[in-house]
């Protein structure tokens, strides 16, 4: 004959075992709720992220190699700098910013166009590149170039002092693009235009999808006014033009 467990175990031991089972269930439910809460950012964390301009995507390591790659004779044909400057409204007397200036490829071309009545700010976070641009400007007798050692999130441009800005194949390297764009906007005159030339990519492959750039620029207070594909027309490179939203 089989006897039930109630007849085998004392009632107080049964009570103890039951209590342990209930405690285990409650602990499991609490752990699950805690894990679910930790998986989702708190409202405060989300607000802090928005205010800081943080992004959640990969970026490329800033280029720090030889500058000769920027001086390919075919680059003018591919990128059409004069057409870029026409679109951005660069003319005699304009103040222009070349953010991520590198070898100064665009800097010197803009300096020739704006003449001695204008200024071209060559901004880079690499001191060696700026030294190269200073030597180049002296060699080419361009007295209207000013070099600026910027920060990763701030080009350190003069407030309301720029008529046109260009980020040429630089945006995919910027770790805090929204913060940098906000500080760039502060340097722009009322009618100034910002041009961003880059290539479609994943962020860490020296490219970033243009739709990502547009959304981040909008978060920073810009509005898209036009886009072009004449810079290396290969369905990869793009040229976006923004102005500060009013």
Where do the model's predicted regions map?
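A short glycine-rich, Lys/Arg-flanked "PGG" loop and its adjoining helix->strand segment in the class I
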Residues: 111-112, 178-193
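Conserved SAM/SAH-binding beta-strand->alpha-helix loop
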Residues: 126
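A short acidic, Gly/Pro-enriched loop at the edge of an enzyme's catalytic core
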Residues: 155-165
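Class I SAM-dependent transferase core
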Residues: 30-97
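A short SAM/SAH-binding and catalytic strip from SAM-dependent methyltransferases
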Residues: 163-177
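Conserved SAM-binding strand-loop segment of SAM-dependent methyltransferases
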Residues: 140-153
């Amino acid at each position: 004959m089989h006897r039930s467990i109630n007849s085998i175990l004392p009632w107080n031991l049964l009570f103890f075992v039951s209590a342990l089972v209930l405690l285990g269930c409650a602990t499991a439910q609490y752990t699950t709720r805690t894990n679910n809460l930790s998986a989702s950012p708190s409202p405060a964390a989300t607000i802090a992220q928005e205010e800081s301009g943080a992004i959640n995507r990969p970026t490329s390591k800033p280029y720090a190699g030889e500058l000769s790659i920027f001086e390919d004779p075919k680059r003018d044909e591919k990128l059409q700098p004069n057409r870029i400057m026409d679109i951005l409204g660069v003319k005699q007397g304009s103040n222009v910013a070349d953010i991520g200036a590198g070898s100064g490829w665009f800097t010197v071309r803009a300096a020739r166009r704006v003449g001695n009545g204008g200024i071209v700010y060559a901004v880079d976070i690499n001191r060696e590149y700026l030294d190269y641009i200073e030597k180049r400007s002296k060699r080419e007798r361009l007295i209207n170039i000013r070099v600026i050692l910027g920060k990763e999130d701030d080009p350190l441009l003069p407030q309301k002092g720029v008529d046109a800005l260009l980020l040429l194949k630089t945006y995919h390297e910027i770790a805090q693009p929204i913060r940098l764009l906000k500080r760039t906007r502060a340097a722009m005159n009322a009618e100034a235009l910002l041009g961003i030339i880059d290539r479609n990519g994943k962020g860490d492959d020296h490219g970033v999808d243009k739709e990502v750039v547009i959304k981040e620029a909008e978060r920073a207070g810009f509005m898209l006014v036009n886009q072009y594909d004449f810079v290396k027309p290969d369905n990869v490179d793009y040229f976006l033009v923004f102005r500060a939203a009013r």
